[in-house]
Amino acid sequence: MKILVINSGSSSLKFQVIDSETERVMARGLCERIGIDGSFTYKTDGGISIKEPVPMNNHKDAVEKLLTALVDPEQGVLGSYDEIDVVGHRLVHGGEKFTGSVVITDEVIQAMTECNDLAPLHNPANLVGVDACKALMPETLMVGVFDTAFNQTMEPKAFLYGLPYRFYEKYKIRRYGFHGISHKYVSARAAEFMGQDIRRVKTIVCHLGNGSSICAIKYGKVIDNSMGFTPLEGLVMGTRCGDVDPGALEFLAAKENLDIHQIMTILNQESGVLGISKNLSSDFRELKDAGIKYNEKASLAREIFAYKVAKYIGSYAAAMNGVDNIVFTAGVGENDSDIREEICEYLGFLGITIDEVKNREQAEAVRISEGTSKVNVLVIRTNEELEIARQAAAVAAQIKEGRE
């Protein structure tokens, strides 16, 4: 079964073609600057690599371009569009309506549209990608894989805020958690790597990148996630503030004469390690280099980030009454060995000891804790596209079984 995985943003569209039987990535690419000047990147497992300017007025143009590339006689990996069995779409926010992957029907699109207020930057862009694919491949099965679905096993004690309950009843204001596709893949891969049954282990996954979240997974089910009603809550991130006292926002608004939209822009785009470093950078590599040159604010930004991560790990270990695996993933989690080491220095109370040599290894999966460590600490390369393909293939298989 060949799966086309689509991750549609407001002005970009990432894609992969995956053979679900072998899990081989046949082709991958990126359509950027849609509606502006347009850029198309395309690579195949056969060694073809293309990057070229391509005018794309809208997402339909982008999908048409990627499909044309996939079936090109010289550069393509497919004989025709008909070889695509399923299109798996990454959908950011499904609210409480969706607890798993679903066939994208008109009813699903309507339900997602009703969730647009919960993710105004992401959901409309996701749906534009769906519409473009439906227009060009009307007979192909479309499956939606929600970034919030994996977190829907959280209990009310974890997802409710200390607000009047009527606001939850009326507006569904609660904690949803994000990065669920990544957390699901990485927690399962960690258990597989360690030869464990995921239904018998307690895992904390640290998805650390420009956007960061931590997820507590007990026996295969999420019990908590550091992100909340929006991806703004939780850790200090690249440009996002993470947890902050709401009272400070009222104070700031009064002092700086700011409205709510200006405040939200600051919290989302001007805060995090970028803000702490006095606008030096949101890139952890650049902050590390600056810290080596005695830039105190750059070092402080990284220090605060590591401290907050360690605090969440400690609280989730308590919430699960123990932890078997702690897993680092995503751009910072996979590649910044110094940050991992700094985080783990706070976790000695859990009996964690880190192997300095292993911690600097680059691999798809590696255990970086010493053999005597009471908790397994791992680095696992996330693969959201593969997880989407797996879930899309599973939905397609269920439909096929129902017909037989």
Could you tell me what each predicted segment is?
Residues 324-347:
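Glycine-rich phosphate-binding loops at beta-strand->alpha-helix junctions
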